[in-house]
From Swiss-Prot:
GO terms for cellular component: external side of plasma membrane; extracellular region; protein-containing complex. Residues 26-118 form the UPAR/Ly6 domain. This is Lymphocyte antigen 6 complex locus protein G5b. Keywords: Disulfide bond, Glycoprotein, Secreted, Signal. The lineage of its organism: Eukaryota, Metazoa, Chordata, Craniata, Vertebrata. It is found in: Secreted. The keyword Disulfide bond applies. Its main location: secreted. N-glycosylated.
Length: 194
């Protein structure tokens, strides 16, 4: 009888000691440019940040229209879930929402796959191809790591980078947006390590 009790106690202690360690990082979706109707244009990735920092969705408005979403790892410890913070910068209005669990900053629309322009059903213009995404990152010139995919060699000039025409936004405007988001402390951009 005592042997059964001892085995039972050892089993319980074994289960209690063998629990998986709690992760000390949060994993979030990362998309530097998401159009509400096209999905993630810049290539979707993931980012990690130490707890208790949040995942974030930053909605960018032009006048009263939602123009873009930026998804990534948040930086402000003062943000509480469901709080919204509004920041005005140039002609854009930024609204930041945070959440406190892995991948909680989910997509607002289905993520489309790149297709050849001119193919049936491509009237909306699809997200950038792999080589265009690489050029997009280079054109922003923010020392961002390249997305995790294999692409064809990118041409030297950035003139061939064509964002979907429905965006109505230049690379210079995008760069200004990302520099503001990073310098304001809203978003942790994944800087490339030397």
């Amino acid at each position: 009888m005592r042997a059964r009790v001892l085995v039972g106690m050892l089993t319980m202690v074994g289960f209690a000691m063998g629990k998986a360690p709690v992760a000390r990082v949060r994993t979030c979706h990362l998309c530097l440019l998401e159009d509400p109707s096209l999905g993630c244009i810049s290539g979707s990735e993931k980012c990690t940040i130490s707890l208790p920092s949040p995942c974030m969705v930053i909605t960018i408005y032009k006048n009263t229209t939602v123009r873009f979403h930026v998804r990534g790892c948040g930086q402000h410890h003062s943000y509480r879930c469901q709080e919204r913070h509004v920041i005005y910068q140039s002609d854009y209005l930024y609204k930041a929402d945070c959440c406190q669990y892995d991948y909680c900053n989910s997509w607002s629309s289905a993520q489309h796959q790149s297709t050849l322009r001119g193919s049936p059903g491509s009237h909306l213009g699809m997200p950038l191809s792999a080589s265009q995404i690489k050029q997009f990152y280079q054109a922003l010139n923010l020392s961002l790591p390249q997305p995790g995919f294999h692409a064809h060699k990118v041409s030297e000039g950035l003139e061939s980078l064509i964002l979907p025409p429905e965006l109505g936004l230049s690379i210079a405007d995008l760069r200004q947006i990302y520099l503001f988001l990073n310098s304001s402390g809203l978003l942790v951009l994944p800087w490339d390590r030397p």
